[in-house]
């Protein structure tokens, strides 16, 4: 099986994005699955277009999107994506939508189709702080998860899609007051998530 793992480009003045730093360090195979890693632009329109191109070309069995959640103190496994773009800051293309749908006429929300609770349980068993999250926000992270789930519902019903938010890296918290997580633990968390997804696909 093939699992597409995506991370984002830096945004909001940051020089790095831990989602891609962790994703790109994943092995090429895990749990019998091939991991294909791609960096996605932190832009509302371009992120969905990039994902569409990857799904068309690669035809993966599962998609695990990864994003940065500044201020988080653990791995957040997202359960739902909502059909809303409402940006506090502009994306990397300068776009800052307010109260816009991700997909005009699309459903209000989609639930993630990867085994979210099982991933959280597996992470905690390894001593990695993790929780289920019921809001992926209204920025590009939620946008990408909604696009993935919408495209799955429309064209690839067997495709499993989900999203994991990671905290800041220590070097991003200059004053030391914001929560952070080491890169090694983030990579281990993504490896574990991929293993759980691969195991479910075998069943």
What is each residue range found by the language model?
Residues 1-136, 149-158, 178-203:
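N-terminal catalytic or cofactor-binding beta/alpha core of small enzyme domains
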Residues 13, 141, 169-176:
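Short active-site-adjacent structural elements
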């Amino acid at each position: 099986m093939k699992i597409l793992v995506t991370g984002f480009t830096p945004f909001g003045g940051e020089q790095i994005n831990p989602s891609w730093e962790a994703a790109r360090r994943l092995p090429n195979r895990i749990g019998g699955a091939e991991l294909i890693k791609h960096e996605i632009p932190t832009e509302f329109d371009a992120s969905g277009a990039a994902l569409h191109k990857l799904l068309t070309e690669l035809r993966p069995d599962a998609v695990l999107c990864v994003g940065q959640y500044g201020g988080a103190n653990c791995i957040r496994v997202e359960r739902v994506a909502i059909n809303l773009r409402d940006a506090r800051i502009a994306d990397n293309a300068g776009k800052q939508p307010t109260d816009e749908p991700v997909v005009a006429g699309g459903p209000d929300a989609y639930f993630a189709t990867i085994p979210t609770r099982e991933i959280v349980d597996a992470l905690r068993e390894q001593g990695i702080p993790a929780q289920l999250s019921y809001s992926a926000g209204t920025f590009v992270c939620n946008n990408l998860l909604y696009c993935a789930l919408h495209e799955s519902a429309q064209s690839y019903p067997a495709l499993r899609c989900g999203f994991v938010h990671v905290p800041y890296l220590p070097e991003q918290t200059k004053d030391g007051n914001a929560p952070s997580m080491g890169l090694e633990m983030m990579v281990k968390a993504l490896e574990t998530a991929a293993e759980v997804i691969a195991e479910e696909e075998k069943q």
